[in-house]
Amino acid sequence: MKLENTLFTLGALGSISAALVIPNLENAADHHELINKEDHHERPRKVEFTKDDDEEPSDSEDKEHGKFHKKGRKGQDKESPEFNGKRASGSHGSAHEGGKGMKPKHESSNDDDNDDKKKKPHHKGGCHENKVEEKKMKGKKVKGKKHHEKTLEKGRHHNRLAPLVSTAQFNPDAISKIIPNRYIIVFKRGAPQEEIDFHKENVQQAQLQSVENLSAEDAFFISTKDTSLSTSEAGGIQDSFNIDNLFSGYIGYFTQEIVDLIRQNPLVDFVERDSIVEATEFDTQNSAPWGLARISHRERLNLGSFNKYLYDDDAGRGVTSYVIDTGVNINHKDFEKRAIWGKTIPLNDEDLDGNGHGTHCAGTIASKHYGVAKNANVVAVKVLRSNGSGTMSDVVKGVEYAAKAHQKEAQEKKKGFKGSTANMSLGGGKSPALDLAVNAAVEVGIHFAVAAGNENQDACNTSPASADKAITVGASTLSDDRAYFSNWGKCVDVFAPGLNILSTYIGSDDATATLSGTSMASPHVAGLLTYFLSLQPGSDSEFFELGQDSLTPQQLKKKLIHYSTKDILFDIPEDTPNVLIYNGGGQDLSAFWNDTKKSHSSGFKQELNMDEFIGSKTDLIFDQVRDILDKLNII
């Protein structure tokens, strides 16, 4: 099956190198997009955006507000549904692509009612006022017409298309991952809900009418017959999302004609082609859980410390951590009944982790033996199928679920609830929709960790690593090197252990596995966010602003980064922060809560007991052993 939209893979593995730079996405509709419509299915297309607020309609456009005509091949006007409706603030714009675009007609006068009526086309579907009633009688269609003039704000025009974005436009390898005719539509922040509902209703009607003229063998129906993704062969809106009115939109299958019209609506920020998200294989081998030990020591590990995790045994209590992944083996003994199933997003999939990746990540966050915060609650949010694949839109829906579940728990104000964290060890090509979803989830209060990716490239080229409000995590090794696969760059915030990490797995209630990747590094940070949240001082302490109940994600992100160990890692590019996370070593955290000036370096000193003193003297031997093991590819 040929697929059409953006690639996503689990952060533990290799994925596609692709960048998409969109200036000022919050006002993406204010940028002009140049797209070669004729060949957009055959090869990636270059999209350019230029600020042009004063652009006037072209000479080829008639001037009559809110009316759209599509020229047929023989020059006749083909009627098209209108999406703006009388509640919209402006009329639609030109959609000229390859000479076949939809043309808006702008009113030249509002005074001559008779002339105006002569100019008005009859619309098929579209809005309530211009609805065409169709009846089938004896195999023939009889069309009734009901037409009312629309009221649009005088003098305002929507002359530019909302951007159509796709990683495949910038990386040919991603074309095979695009899902044909399936799109994620994102509204501008603050778009009125009444107008959104009106727009969606019209889109649904127009899509149903759009497929009436298609033959049963049309390629559109090939994509919509995939019952693992589609709920209707006719297509249309399948699902919607809304995170506290900060990030909203809908998902569905649409013909090209309807996509063109959707992009003309002033409510729409951008349209993104949906795509397949995949997990690839990863190495499994026996190893010790050195990662926990590393984040609890500032100095380099030695034979006396490499397997010692220093922590507060109350860490994690009162915090809920959402694992947005392949699911979680919630019956694993190491979760001690603190793990529950939240939601399965993929259509017709089962409530279990048939892959293992999500269970492994959850174990690093909160399991008894392998977790950073050993008392936290875990919620499984399945966005990838048991075979390790899913869609970008399902990932967006998973983020929405976590955000709403957090808001509900926070509003209930249950005794002992201290906040929510989330981990998403996914990575792939740039997706504005996913980045905005993650940022919106952070804005409503979730402390978010995401994997930097495993392509040894600039993390800013991938999503959700480029979501600026999350904490983006690169992977380090036992020898304090940047892992050879780990992405880098200014979008990386911190590093955490990510090579040969032992954690919980699937197959039984006590299964374990050792995996590698930034997918394994990110849960260390999600666990550490959970750790600090659970141990935060009371709201009446000096650490909080007056009236504040808990640290905001922005505040905790800043403190976590500042408290981390600086300049201790090797092979870190110049534009990449040399920062390794640190949990405080199980000691008093007053320095963490108070610390706003002092930077912590690898020269941190503390009083050593006898065991630690002896261990420190073995550093040289340990380094030599490590070099030998490194050469044998054992570590």
Swiss-Prot record:
Entry-linked PROSITE patterns: SUBTILASE, SUBTILASE_ASP, SUBTILASE_HIS, SUBTILASE_SER
Main subcellular localisation: other
Compositional bias ranges of the Basic residues kind: 137-155
Catalytic activity: Hydrolysis of proteins with broad specificity, and of Bz-Arg-OEt > Ac-Tyr-OEt. Does not hydrolyze peptide amides
Protein name in the entry: Cerevisin
GO molecular function: serine-type endopeptidase activity
GO terms classed as biological process: pexophagy; protein catabolic process in the vacuole; proteolysis; sporulation resulting in formation of a cellular spore
Family: Belongs to the peptidase S8 family.
Record's miscellaneous remark: [beta] is the prion form of PrB. In contrast to other prions, [beta] is not the result of a conformational change of the cellular PrB, but distinguishes itself by autoactivation in trans. Usually, PrB is already involved in its own maturation, but PrA plays a critical role. PrpA mutants lack PrB. However, in growth conditions that favor PRB1 expression, PrB activity persists in PrA mutants due to autocleavage of PrB in trans. This condition is stably transmitted to daughter cells in mitosis. [beta] can be cured by growing in PRB1-repressing conditions.
InterPro entries for the chain: PCSK9_ProteinaseK-like, Peptidase_S8/S53_dom, Peptidase_S8/S53_dom_sf, Peptidase_S8_Asp-AS, Peptidase_S8_His-AS, Peptidase_S8_Ser-AS, Peptidase_S8_subtilisin-like, Peptidase_S8_subtilisin-rel
Cysteine disulfide partners in this protein: C460-C491
Start and end residues of each Peptidase S8 domain: 289-614
Induction of the gene: Repressed by glucose.
Biased composition (Basic and acidic residues): 35-50, 74-85, 94-109, 126-136
Keywords linked to the UniProt accession: Amyloid, Disulfide bond, Glycoprotein, Hydrolase, Prion, Protease, Serine protease, Signal, Vacuole, Zymogen
Residues of the signal peptide: 1-19
Lineage: Eukaryota, Fungi, Dikarya, Ascomycota, Saccharomycotina
Prosegment location in residue numbers: 20-280, 575-635
Post-translational modification: Activated by N- and C-terminal proteolytic cleavage. Protease B (PrB/PRB1) processing requires at least 4 cleavages. First, the signal peptide is removed from the 76 kDa preproprotease B by signal peptidase in the ER. Then, PrB removes its own Pro-region (in trans) at the N-terminus, producing a 39 kDa form before exiting the ER. In the Golgi complex, the C-terminal Post-region of the 40 kDa proprotease B undergoes protease A (PrA/PEP4)-mediated processing to a 37 kDa intermediate, which in turn is quickly processed again by PrB in trans to yield the 31 kDa mature PrB.
Subcellular location: Vacuole
Region (Disordered): 35-155
Any Gene Ontology CC annotation: fungal-type vacuole lumen
Biological role stated in the UniProt entry: Vacuolar proteinase B involved in protein degradation in the vacuole. Among other substrates, acts on carboxypeptidase Y (cpY/PRC1) to activate it by processing its Pro-peptide. Required for meiosis and spore formation, and for optimal survival in stationary phase.
Domain Inhibitor I9: 182-278
